[in-house]
Amino acid sequence: DDNRHLLKPPVGNQQVYKGNDDFIVMVVGGPNSRKDYHYDEGEEFFYQLEGDIILKIIEDGKPKDIEIKEGEIFLLPARTPHSPQRGANTVGLVMEVNRRPGMQDRLQWYCEKCNNLLHEGFLELKDIETELKAAMETFYASTDLRTCKVKECGAVMEPPVKLA
């Protein structure tokens, strides 16, 4: 409760145990406003403390929604693109494996009209609280990156609604 004010969009995360060698342990609160999909080489553990969330994933090239209800846990398999959608007053605990040197995370954006991969950014993640947000800002600042290159489509992804 003392740190709820730190859970700010677009991601809403706050690392709990900094300096831990093995795990990134975060509390993540809603609402968030995300259109990106995070791709992690390791598994991610979700424990939903308050409220229900939708974890959007890409499975076999197609979008799929997984509901994680309050009190439930979910282990996301490694290398599964995912986009947590958190409503207001939701709080969850998320654990990820700390990145080893050379490991790269990815942020992916898919066309909202045809599901084509619009852009994939690579990060050697050192500070999860700041680097995800910076990569998102770079993507949304570029109309070219947000424009679908499929000739029959050409849709332009609008940036997500900014939340306070």
Residue ranges of each PLM-predicted region?
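Jelly-roll (double-stranded beta-helix
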Residues: D1-Y47, D52-I73, P81-A164
